[in-house]
Curated annotation (Swiss-Prot):
This is UvrABC system protein C. PANTHER family: UVRABC SYSTEM PROTEIN C, UVRC/OXIDOREDUCTASE. The gene is uvrC. It comes from the Bacteria. CDD domains: GIY-YIG_UvrC_Cho. Keywords: Cytoplasm, DNA damage, DNA excision, DNA repair, Excision nuclease, SOS response. Belongs to the UvrC family. It is found in: Cytoplasm. Residues 18-97 form the GIY-YIG domain. Interacts with UvrB in an incision complex. One of its GO terms (cellular component) is cytoplasm.
Length: 630
């Protein structure tokens, strides 16, 4: 920041109010680069303009880029916390702690607010009257649990639309897996009582579940209903088998807890959350904070830990208790508890773990954080070497920290769509993915479609510029992209075309198992070819494949509901005959998704490899991504 501008902003800050609120710092391009909250806005913001010796290198860099500071007043400090988290989520400022998480972890959603509740896989916790359990580490594991609970407690698995329109029971009732509440073969009150066991199971109240089912089994045996008794016996054994696989921390606890630990150095910091539900560990979740050193003497660990808690629990399930690895003080503890209560509607205890059981959980989180940090850093260093090779081979002015790739897709004559995929530091940055419906082009015209997409993309000056654009195609597509960038005034951005070299077998319409990726550069006749095991190649081919996948999932979303076959059309290796076999065996796409690989592999024309591919691709569409349409 120029000296005169620095003094101008500093003088302006002196007039800030002393109330609570949120402040927004902007750079010369009027882009928000940092968002913070304060009990006293004037005192907090003025602290940035004190002697820079008291600041960390990151804060000094932030201050040097400040051109304007704005504020929003709030009635309370709790409101400031809530507003800060939502604004950070919306604007993603460069200098705020940004949670790096490769995916949104799945929850089990029990629609308890419905008249006839059912189970779903969910990627977000919403205030919709449902009960949420999780987060879990595997979508397939969640599907397996839902399938188990549906069978054990005879929970309906049909959609709400099917449920409301049925006039006679479906096959699920006929094979004894549902009680047909849709056609009133059971009252809604009795149905809810029947499925109550699944709720207790998910809450960890397993002794109650087993006791209740055992009583029903004995009653059925006394009445000589031996088939019913046998089914209940098998269900009890299945529940016991699942419980034996879970790590038990406290078998008497019914609390939901999260325990936090962290590990890091000058390369970054990894915060680990360990999720304990009713005394059982159901999973762990890593969150990497790049370029943040938790051991820096200038950084206040209480401040960044509270910032993490505020952002993390803006979107995630809030447990009964949060166990911390350090003491954040009474004032911040009470404030954080108020913030969490405001979000969840129920009391959450936040505390520094000092008891033996709590310390053991925090130590577990710390050890997981250390292990994941070392793996992440090793992987990150490989990515940096790959980006450095891209810079050298493509003769770029700087290392391409941000790479964007675009894919134009038209499926079976349907409307044309496009995807924008972003890699930052060599890995997917899904929060920056974008989807486009082509609005100005009729029919198939890739050049006009790409022109529209790039024009719309670069109207957003608030987005960071990429250091490289990857276009799927050879010299022709590269030439078109260069022409478009020149016409929209962005020829300063490097662009490369990615194409596959074909072998002679390709002329015979055979599938090419091994191809050589070729990269075409402006003004160069010969392509750049990387070694087959080069990290640079993994990054570049990875972003191309990701853009293609993301565009296809968009088509799938648009076509959802038009036909059962539409979702199966995208599964590689699945022809018409195999689709008919699947749809004959299973009632719906949801049933296929929840099937075991062994079930599918036993079908005529299927094997284990194909079964796992089908489940992977069908369930892939449920991975949480940033659903932003431009």
């Amino acid at each position: 920041m120029a000296s005169s501008k620095f003094e101008e902003v500093r003088d302006k800050v002196k007039e800030f109010p002393t109330q609570s609120g949120v402040y927004l710092m902007k750079n010369t391009a009027d882009k928000i680069i940092y968002i913070g909250k304060a009990k006293n806005l004037r005192n907090r913001v003025r602290s940035y303009f004190n002697d820079s010796k008291d600041h960390s290198p990151k804060t000094r860099l932030l201050v040097s880029n400040i051109c304007e500071v704005e504020y929003i007043l709030t009635k309370t400090e709790v409101e400031a916390f809530l507003l800060e988290a939502s604004l950070i989520k919306k604007h993603r400022p460069k200098y705020n702690i940004r949670l790096r998480d490769d995916k949104a972890y799945p929850y089990i959603r029990f629609s308890w607010g419905d008249q006839a509740p059912r189970l779903y896989l969910a990627r977000k916790v919403k205030k919709d009257g449902s009960l949420y359990f999780g987060p879990y580490t595997s979508g397939l594991a969640v599907h397996g649990t839902i399938k188990f609970l549906n069978r054990t407690f005879k929970i309906r698995d049909c959609t709400d639309a099917v449920f409301k329109s049925r006039t006679r029971p479906c096959m699920t009732y006929q094979i004894g897996r549902c009680t047909a509440p849709c056609v009133k073969y059971i009252t809604m009150e009795d149905y809810r009582n029947e499925v109550e066991g699944a709720k207790l199971f998910l809450k960890g109240q397993n002794k109650k579940v087993i006791k209740s089912m055992t009583e029903k089994m004995m009653g059925a045996a006394d009445e000589e209903k031996f088939e019913v008794a046998a089914r209940l016996r098998d269900s009890i054994e299945a529940i016991k088998a699942i419980l034996q696989k879970q790590a038990v921390i406290n078998d008497t606890s019914e609390k939901d807890q999260d325990a936090l630990g962290y590990y890091g150095d000058e390369r970054g910091c990894l915060i680990e959350t360990v999720h304990i539900r009713a005394g059982r560990v159901i999973g762990t979740r890593p969150h990497y904070l790049p370029h943040f050193d938790p051991n820096d003497a200038v950084e206040d660990p209480r401040e960044w830990l509270v910032d993490f808690l505020n952002q993390y629990y803006e979107d995630n399930f809030i447990p009964d208790e949060v166990l911390l690895p350090l003491d954040i003080g009474n004032d911040l503890t009470k404030l954080m508890e108020e913030v969490l209560k405001e979000r969840s509607g129920s009391k959450t205890t936040v505390r520094f773990a000092t008891d033996e059981r709590g310390r053991n959980l925090v130590d577990m989180a710390h050890e997981n954080a250390k292990s994941h940090f070392l793996k992440y850093v090793s992987k990150s260093e490989e990515k940096l070497r790959g980006l450095e090779e891209i810079k050298e081979r493509f003769n770029l002015p700087e290392r391409p920290r941000r790479i964007e790739c675009y894919d134009i897709s038209t499926f079976q004559g349907a409307e044309t769509v496009a995807s924008q995929v972003v890699f930052e530091d060599g890995v997917p940055a899904k929060e920056h993915y974008r989807r486009y419906k082509i609005k100005t082009v009729q029919g198939i015209n890739d050049f006009a479609s790409m022109y529209e997409v790039l024009s719309r993309r670069f109207k957003h000056t608030e987005y960071d510029d990429p250091q490289l654009i990857v276009i799927d195609g050879g010299k022709g597509q590269l030439s078109q992209a260069m022409k478009i960038l020149e016409e929209i005034g962005r020829k300063d951005i490097p662009v490369v075309g990615l194409a596959k070299a074909r072998t002679e077998s390709d002329f015979q319409k055979q599938e090419v198992e091994s191809t050589e990726e070729r990269f075409f550069l402006p003004g160069r006749s010969n392509p750049v070819i990387f070694k087959h095991n080069a990290e640079a190649l993994y990054i570049l081919s990875g972003i191309r494949d990701e853009a293609h996948r993301f565009a296809i999932t968009y088509h799938r979303k648009l076509r959802e509901g038009t036909s059962l076959e539409s979702e199966l059309d995208y599964v590689v290796g699945l022809g018409e005959k195999r689709k008919k076999v699947l749809l004959t065996q299973f009632n719906s796409i949801d049933e296929i998704k929840m099937a075991d690989p062994e079930e599918i592999a036993k079908l005529k024309g299927f094997n284990r490899v194909l079964a796992e591919r089908i489940l992977l691709q069908l369930n892939e569409s449920e991975e949480e991504e940033t659903e932003v349409e431009e």
